UniProtKB/Swiss-Prot annotation:
One of its GO terms (molecular function) is ABC-type taurine transporter transporter activity. Belongs to the ABC transporter superfamily. Taurine importer (TC 3.A.1.17.1) family. It is found in: Cell inner membrane. It comes from Shigella flexneri. The keyword Cell membrane applies. PROSITE patterns: ABC_TRANSPORTER_2, TAUB. SUPFAM superfamilies: P-loop containing nucleoside triphosphate hydrolases. GO terms for cellular component: plasma membrane. The complex is composed of two ATP-binding proteins (TauB), two transmembrane proteins (TauC) and a solute-binding protein (TauA). It comes from the Bacteria. PANTHER family: TAURINE IMPORT ATP-BINDING PROTEIN TAUB (PTHR42788:SF18), TAURINE IMPORT ATP-BINDING PROTEIN-RELATED (PTHR42788). This is Taurine import ATP-binding protein TauB. CDD domains: ABC_NrtD_SsuB_transporters. ATP binds at G34, P35, S36, G37, C38, G39, K40, T41.
């Protein structure tokens, strides 16, 4: 379980997050949404251990987070892949740094690529892949170390609508299959409503928890309902419009 208590953080000398209290249970998919500058990415970087926080605590499985760790896998919008390595070696890179024996890490990489639909692409290079395929490699790399918690920072923001829909459904299937805790940062309201089992709305900076919503659209998808059917459901449309109105309230209040 991820537990965040009374978290305060600065960014560039200014308050970025203020009194954040969140819990992410095992098997849940938490989505954080808010206007630009609300501290979404700062929150992910704090959980990942990339930057320090000023007050409060972040704990995963009862252990305080004070730096990066293999129990947290991170996927970025710009992937951060190594262009001089092939796909398989990119996925296996973290395992290599951890001292995993070569044959074992290549087998793990193969299995992760199979999970994300890139079996057979092991020897291709990053420049030979589409944007969506590169994000699949990034997800496979993050999963290779078998983390307890998967963190994703607007991973589909630069993708076209069709590819973004494919990646959303892939991530939900992986979430169901692995049972991992997932925390997704996004600025896309429809994506947030579709994918979250719990949706957290942040206020304009400094970010505070404005509202928490329990949603069931992601569970309906993994139970077999199509994404098209879900997104055309009046309940989904109403929730999307409600969340949109809350985000616009924050934009107007601080404009």
């Amino acid at each position: 379980m991820l537990q965040i208590s009374h978290l305060y953080a600065d960014y560039g000398g200014k308050p970025a997050l203020e009194d954040i209290n969140l819990t992410l249970e095992s098997g849940e998919l938490l989505v954080v949404l808010g206007p630009s500058g609300c501290g979404k990415t700062t929150l992910l970087n704090l959980i990942a251990g990339f930057v320090p926080y000023q007050h409060g605590s972040i704990q995963l499985a009862g252990k305080r987070i004070e730096g990066p760790g293999a129990e947290r896998g991170v996927v970025f919008q710009n992937e951060g892949l190594l262009p001089w390595r092939n796909v398989q070696d990119n996925v296996a890179f973290g395992l290599q740094l951890a001292g995993i024996e070569k044959m074992q890490r290549l087998e793990i990489a193969h299995q992760m690529l199979k999970k994300v639909g890139l079996e057979g692409a092991e020897k291709r290079y990053i420049w030979q892949l589409s944007d969506g395929q590169r994000q699949r490699v990034g997800i496979a790399r993050a999963l290779a170390a078998n983390p307890q918690l998967l963190l994703l920072d607007e991973p589909f923001g630069a993708l076209d609508a069709f590819t973004r829909d494919q990646m959303q459904t892939l991530l939900l299937k992986l979430w169901q299959e692995t049972g991992k805790q997932v925390l997704l940062i996004t600025h896309d309201i429809e994506e947030a409503v579709f994918m979250a089992t719990e949706l957290v709305l942040l206020s304009s900076g400094p970010g505070r928890v404005l509202e928490r919503l329990r949603l069931n659209f992601a569970r309906r998808f993994v139970a077999g309902e199509s994404s098209r059917s879900i997104k055309s459901d009046p309940q989904f449309i109403a929730m999307r419009e409600y969340v949109l109105s809350r985000v616009f309230e924050q934009r107007e209040a601080f404009s």
